[in-house]
Amino acid sequence: MPKLKTSKAIAKRFKVSSSGKFLRHKASKSHLLQKKSSKQRRHLSSTCSVDLKDIKNIAMQLPYL
C-alpha cells in the first residue's frame, strides 16, 4: 500500500493541539486594519478551534498529524 500524501496547503493552515483538536487562525487580519478597532484586531489574532463539521475533511488530508 502506498504512502498517504499530506496536503501541504492544509498543513500550513492548521495545527494540532496537545489534546488533539485542530486549531486555525481567524480571517480578516491581513489588510484593511485601519478601520477595525484595536479590540477587534486583538481578538482576530487569537487562534480558535475548527468546527466539528470540518474536522473529518481536515483529518483526511493530514494523515500523519
UniProtKB/Swiss-Prot annotation:
Main subcellular location: plastid
Bias (Basic residues): 25-44
PROSITE patterns found in the cross-reference section: RIBOSOMAL_L35
Annotated region (Disordered), positions in chain: 25-45
A Pfam family annotated for this UniProt entry: Ribosomal_L35p
Keyword tags: Chloroplast, Plastid, Ribonucleoprotein, Ribosomal protein
GO molecular function, one term: structural constituent of ribosome
Signal peptide boundaries: none
InterPro entries: Ribosomal_bL35 (IPR001706), Ribosomal_bL35-like (IPR021137), Ribosomal_bL35_CS (IPR018265), Ribosomal_bL35_sf (IPR037229)
Entry GO terms, CC: chloroplast; large ribosomal subunit
GO biological processes: translation
HAMAP family in the cross-refs: Ribosomal_bL35
PANTHER family linked to this entry: 54S RIBOSOMAL PROTEIN BL35M, LARGE RIBOSOMAL SUBUNIT PROTEIN BL35M
Similarity section: Belongs to the bacterial ribosomal protein bL35 family.
Name of this protein: Large ribosomal subunit protein bL35c
Organism: Pyropia yezoensis
Name of the gene: rpl35
